[in-house]
Amino acid sequence: MAEKRAEKRKFNTEAWEPKTQIGRMVKEGTISDISYIMDKGLPLLEPEIVDALLPDLEEQVLDVKLVQRMHKSGRRARYRATVVVGNKNGYVGVGMGKSKEVGPAIRKAIAHAKLSLIKVRVGCGSWECGCGSPHSIPFTAKGACGSVKVELLPAPRGVGLVAGNVAKAVLGLAGVKDAWTKTFGDTRTTYNFAEATFDALNNLNFVRCLPNQKEKLGLTEGRVL
């Protein structure tokens, strides 16, 4: 499922009725850049905010599984969908949704992924390259979810994404073009694998750099182009 092509959806801003103050400011045009919301630490409570500010966002279904849980009346089955969204230019999110039907489960996962959207730091942290362009990640990062642990390493230009299909989908929609990965644990669990990769990308944002280091690494946050 991870190799399914990403899709874009058109969003009608005029038909949208915001429920939050930030949503109303976005519709009125007071806020026109999603990085402003993230830099201020404002909460993303409506997926439509992401649709309005990132019209080039793509969605990719990584996995749909039938899961069961025991109840006093017997086994209850639901579908669990794992989705990644991103614009291939510095923004990415991962989400999961559950429902009795496949369609609603995917829609819930898409909404969850949009609300978990983060800015991604890109750069050139490989000692083999040093070109200073934002094609890889600026430094090594680690992430974990459940039993799965993922380590991302900068790679020189042209290597591509040396990763499993799930991690490759997350990194690709984040805008990372070259990277090496190390994985530990049960990576067959799609959501944990995707979330661990997402966690590693998010951890890049907590590393402090001096201005001269940022220039050397070609470090860029959010949109590159």
From Swiss-Prot:
The keyword Ribonucleoprotein applies. With S4 and S12 plays an important role in translational accuracy. Belongs to the universal ribosomal protein uS5 family. GO terms for cellular component: cytosolic small ribosomal subunit. It holds the Pfam family Ribosomal_S5. It comes from Methanococcus maripaludis (strain DSM 14266 / JCM 13030 / NBRC 101832 / S2 / LL). Keywords: Ribonucleoprotein, Ribosomal protein, RNA-binding, rRNA-binding. Part of the 30S ribosomal subunit. Contacts protein S4. PROSITE patterns: RIBOSOMAL_S5 (PS00585), S5_DSRBD (PS50881). The N-terminal domain interacts with the head of the 30S subunit; the C-terminal domain interacts with the body and contacts protein S4. The interaction surface between S4 and S5 is involved in control of translational fidelity. GO terms for molecular function: rRNA binding; structural constituent of ribosome. The keyword rRNA-binding applies. One of its GO terms (biological process) is translation. Residues 57-120 form the S5 DRBM domain. Gene3D superfamilies: 3.30.160.20, 3.30.230.10. The gene is rps5. This is Small ribosomal subunit protein uS5. HAMAP family: Ribosomal_uS5_A. SUPFAM superfamilies: dsRNA-binding domain-like (SSF54768), Ribosomal protein S5 domain 2-like (SSF54211).
